[in-house]
């Protein structure tokens, strides 16, 4: 898949079985990602983004793992970044969180709610409402489900029983299974339940921006569908979601807007439903499926 943004011929038929992609739709997927005239949702036209990233790069010594990244996420919007293993997806999230290893160095501009945050510590970013659910979930296995959730509230320095109980009921509303297992040790949960707990713990801090690193990793298809359905429901809360996924089909089903990351460069972008019908994305990431990717 060529990383050249200007490349691309409009599709004359839809390999997924949907309506043919128009010339204008195909062209929009190669527009400058920093261009506000290339919206993912109507909100882009009237509201400033929660997150706006420009010319973002990450180096490990002399190796540039990520270069020239530009993306934006609106309130209540789900933006996905798909791509193969080793493309730099986790590096992107860790760089945005300020969580790179000591050998990593980030450059470029990160604006969160209009504020430059490149110099802020991880703790300061969390306090401002940015939460990352890492690929390995990083739960406390010997602690109960509820104790793990309580730690999420502490991350934002929340005080008072009223705040805590309100946040807890919100999370239990999204994840009824966690409520059933609230006194159970996290280490005894299934893989899907552990992922639910990791997301729930992040939500306990009432984030404005939630970043998810491969939430479908290692999960059965039915559990992936359940997790993605819950992520889709986050739109109702106004939380902005940046979803990193290798499972392109699942990600494009739930997202409003998407980017394709290859060898450290954002090579393609567009509304998720258009990316799902783009021949290059179909051939490389969706296989030869004959039915359109539904939108949750």
Question: What do these predicted regions represent?
Answer:
Residues 105-115, 162-168:
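Conserved ABC transporter NBD signature motif
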Residues 82-84:
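The feature captures the beta-strand-to-loop junction immediately N-terminal to the Walker
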